[in-house]
Amino acid sequence: MKTVVVSGASVAGTAAAYWLGRHGYSVTMVERHPGLRPGGQAIDVRGPALDVLERMGLLAAAQEHKTRIRGASFVDRDGNELFRDTESTPTGGPVNSPDIELLRDDLVELLYGATQPSVEYLFDDSISTLQDDGDSVRVTFERAAAREFDLVIGADGLHSNVRRLVFGPEEQFVKRLGTHAAIFTVPNFLELDYWQTWHYGDSTMAGVYSARNNTEARAALAFMDTELRIDYRDTEAQFAELQRRMAEDGWVRAQLLHYMRSAPDFYFDEMSQILMDRWSRGRVALVGDAGYCCSPLSGQGTSVALLGAYILAGELKAAGDDYQLGFANYHAEFHGFVERNQWLVSDNIPGGAPIPQEEFERIVHSITIKDY
């Protein structure tokens, strides 16, 4: 049986592990976090990505985890409602659409559950070195003993360790978009009822939306700065920057900054894209944000990750023992769709205007997935 190690147990990694296992691979998953990484924003599964969930037998379960958000309010700095929208929301788009909006960690839990019977998980560990001799890849880990695998899949996100080890430094491939954003869990102190509330200040944005049947909420804070560089691992520097920029901008920012410091799942990063001419080298391939991050601003990151995992595993199956052909066909089948979805980020649109919904839907549905 062919062996593969997948690095990164988020959406792309767990989906790839599922499909590789289903297609006959012995799969090992390595994840730096001690368990599944908690938290994350509301994410969307759209168009053909819904077909991927259905083929995994997870569509009904994903629908059960929908946020069921009914709409959004937009307020001034004193909390007075300026207007409300019951047709679409900033996080999920049209309210009455076939798309599924759910929390990131809920989707990952579903994917993890689907892989558990057949996938070996190495939590609290990471790949240290990769040595591809043409016949196999020798992988050393920070904790586990070194092993050899037929293939290595990097699904370890925007700041991919596998990409760095095989292709080189992140700066070669990253396109920074200038928006810095934080997301974290807070109590539902606004008593939101399947609802979102947003305030746009002069230079910052803050939003809160209810989660888990109104028992808690997610907070989002964001600002624009094309010159700022903060290490994505330096939480204290992130806290300080958010405090400096947000404290005077009104609404409930003071409460959010208070909750921020004790949140169990605080996440902060600059919105970025990863642009690569190729997603594989030798016996190593990338999937999801590691190879072609669209950024959360595209609204398509999760769907692209699910589709990429499905197509990567499917093309490897179709190619039999010829992994090079499988990797090449994965790129040929998918790179056009990736490019169209990366184009969705508004800095590509004249004047930064929102993309018309019709054009967005055209791009979402601009791929037909095969039966592998």
UniProtKB/Swiss-Prot annotation:
Q: Which Gene3D superfamilies match?
A: D-Amino Acid Oxidase, subunit A, domain 2, FAD/NAD(P)-binding domain
Please list the GO terms describing molecular function: FAD binding
Protein name, UniProt field:
Uncharacterized protein MT1298
